[in-house]
Amino acid sequence: MLPRLFCYHVCMRKQVSFLASRARLWLQNPAPFAVLLGTALLYVGALVSGLAEDVLDNESIVLTDGWLAHWLAAHRTPVGIGIFDAITFLGNWEVAVVVLTAAVVFLWNRRRRSALAMIVATTGSQIVVSLGKAGFGRPRPPAVLTVITRLDASFPSGHSSISVALYALGFYLLFHSTRSPRLKRLWLALAFLFPLLIGFSRLYLGVHYLSDVLGGWGVGLWWSILVVGVPDFVRRRSAANTQAADLRSRPNTAK
């Protein structure tokens, strides 16, 4: 039994590795990559807009919002409040400005494109969040359910969008520029962990509903895909054009 399982595991790894290499080769072509990028942006945008429509129409997600807010309020502990209050601090705009400024200063002379990507993603996502809050005007959870009192609108969550557009994107860029497999695993884990912790902290402290957090994640993800995908597409198209020009410039030796 064990030899069979081992053989199956090895064969599956080889198949996955082969498919991944073929996919990378296929995506070197700018046309398939453009289709993939456009599909991802449209899909995430549709998810966020659909979520916003459900919130406006009081669909089932609103019932889930209320149930989860009451359940978390009934199960809070002083230790939990202290932990998640510290975690949610990372998503405050003051902290985000400091982190973004430090990242830009560090990256500007090393990886300027990465610095610009973080600026555009963070700024763009916060503009969308501000417009969403002003447009939807959704009230925060009732004061009896909250630990932190906030007076601005609830949907979408600014902390959640920052957790993706700033922190997750930053860790992804570190993952992309690191050669060490161990560090790659660390950056990838943090890219998922930070949004999850910051998003859950907003729920635990009662300052946001679940749909607010999901909407904020979606906004941050859309901008992150945009700032990573568009430069990659430009690079692929430039490489393809250079390769085509090189082929055209070669003398025709066919007889």
Spell out what each predicted region is:
Residues 35-36, 94-97, 115-120, 185-192, ...:
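Hydrophobic alpha-helical transmembrane segments
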Residues 14-22, 145-255:
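Membrane-embedded catalytic cores of phosphoryl/pyrophosphoryl-handling enzymes
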Residues 29-37, 85, 112, 178-188:
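Membrane-water interface of alpha-helical transmembrane segments
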Residues 49-50, 130-140, 197-208:
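C-terminal ends of transmembrane alpha-helices
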